[in-house]
Amino acid sequence: MRNCCQEHRLSAGHLEPEISSSCASDVKSSPDMDSVSSQDSLYLPNSVGASLEDQDLWAQFHQEGTEMIITKSGRRMFPQCKIRLFGLHPYAKYMLLVDFVPLDNFRYKWNKNQWEAAGKAEPHPPCRTYVHPDSPAPGAHWMKDAICFQKLKLTNNTLDQQGHIILHSMHRYKPRFHVVQSDDMYNSPWGLVQVFSFPETEFTAVTAYQNEKITKLKINHNPFAKGFREQERSHKRDDVLKTLQQSPSKRQKRKKWEDSPEAEISDFPKATRVKEESIMDPAGVYQNWVSDHEANQGLTPHSPESDGANQEQQVPSSSSNFYNRNPYRRSSQHLSSPYDLGEPSSRRLTPDVATVPDSDPDSLAVLHVIPTQNSTQDRTCGVNFSMEAQMKQPLRGAMYSPYGAEQWMVPAQGQYRPMGYTAYPTDLSTQGAVAHPHSGMSDWSQYSLFPYSCW
């Protein structure tokens, strides 16, 4: 009897199959068990039982030869392993584990709609045991509801590091359910072990379904099967075909709309539909762009050079004022082509200075130039302004002179040493070359760079 109990403890540590009947009888007749109360005798190891859930579904698969898909990343089982336990002590803690053992030592193949042996089985990989995530838990927790191993996955990757069950393809296996009494998975010793297995759960591991009947059963009972997704795609294709059947009438309506005048108007470019706005001279609005001499010549609000519409508005800036005061730079520019005049302003990138449009020589012959009096340079304005609100304002002269005389005042004599040259004249137009008494570079070092304090 002692030898049997020692073998029983060894089997509990290594998760061996069921306890033998002789050992179980010895446990019942032991003197230690006689002192156990009648209430505790209800929770003896031999009183623990288990039943398979979804047994009818498992029976349908077992009749055709159950197949389970295994992949490199791991695949869940269907039908799922689901059992129900009873006879456990409600306050004692138990652990629930599952492992898979081969049914025989053969490798199988699918031939002529049946499985047949095809040789010796491959060496079994290291046995792995899947521990239920709720372990350890009191017996009342395990007996409360059916226990499902939903997250259990099967793989054929021998180097798997995710804890999946490693199996060989074309081999037959069966799952075993172990009930272990233990308060802790690692520290406390394991108690008595009860092992359960069900013949309906036997299956053949495959990488692809071999039996078409098994495939149909999977599609009909597994809501996550691939066949359901293919069926949804077929429904979508049917919807597309229905829309294609209605498309001729829609195309006919589209054709009628294209023949209507509204479609012709919508096909015109945006530049041709832009409302032409009246043009006015910049002298009436931006007086700082035109000198006093030109403002007094009585320029008309409508520029004769611009017959087309132009949506571009020129905003005065510091650089634009300098540009209009420099006749040499302005004379080097050209007029823009007439196609640029009708282009929307949102698509044109205007520079900081006031630009003068360019044009080809043929278009220059059409434009008329207003000659200015007492001036040898052509200062015609090639920019059109579209601001109707400012047309009624009278033409005015410049609001300020370019420079004041105070900026060119000669510094006090006490600040710098006496020099042999005169200060700059107030009239900027009469400035000329100034003769300096110093001819060498070394003589310039005793004076400041600028003889005037303008900033």
From Swiss-Prot:
Residues 229-241 have a biased composition (Basic and acidic residues). Vegetally localized in oocytes and expressed in the presumptive endoderm and mesoderm at early gastrula stage. Expression is down-regulated in the endoderm by the end of gastrulation but maintained in the lateral and ventral mesoderm of the blastopore lip. It is found in: Nucleus. One of its GO terms (biological process) is positive regulation of DNA-templated transcription. It comes from the Eukaryota. Coiled coil: none annotated. GO terms for cellular component: nucleus. SMART domains: TBOX. One of its GO terms (molecular function) is DNA-binding transcription factor activity. It holds the Pfam family T-box. Residues 229-276, 295-360 are annotated as: Disordered. Residues 308-326 have a biased composition (Polar residues). Residues 57-230 bind DNA. The keyword DNA-binding applies. Keywords: Activator, Developmental protein, DNA-binding, Nucleus, Transcription, Transcription regulation. Forms a repression complex on the promoters of the nodal/nr1 and siamois genes with the maternal factors tcf7l1/tcf3 and pouf5.1/oct-25. Interacts (via C-terminus) with tcf7l1/tcf3 (via N-terminus). Also interacts with the other POU-domain transcription factors pou5f1.2/oct-91 and pou5f1.3/oct-60. PANTHER family: MGA, MAX DIMERIZATION PROTEIN (PTHR11267:SF200), T-BOX PROTEIN-RELATED (PTHR11267). Transcription factor required for both mesoderm and endoderm formation in the embryo; signaling determinants and concentration levels may determine which germ layer is formed. Acts together with beta-catenin to activate genes that are responsible for mesoderm induction including wnt-8, eomes t/bra, siamois, mix1 and sox17. Directly binds to promoter DNA. Patterns the mesoderm along the dorsoventral and posterior axis. Activates siamois gene transcription when alone or in combination with beta-catenin, but inhibits siamois transcription in combination with pou5f1.1/oct-25. This is T-box protein VegT. The lineage of its organism: Eukaryota, Metazoa, Chordata, Craniata, Vertebrata.
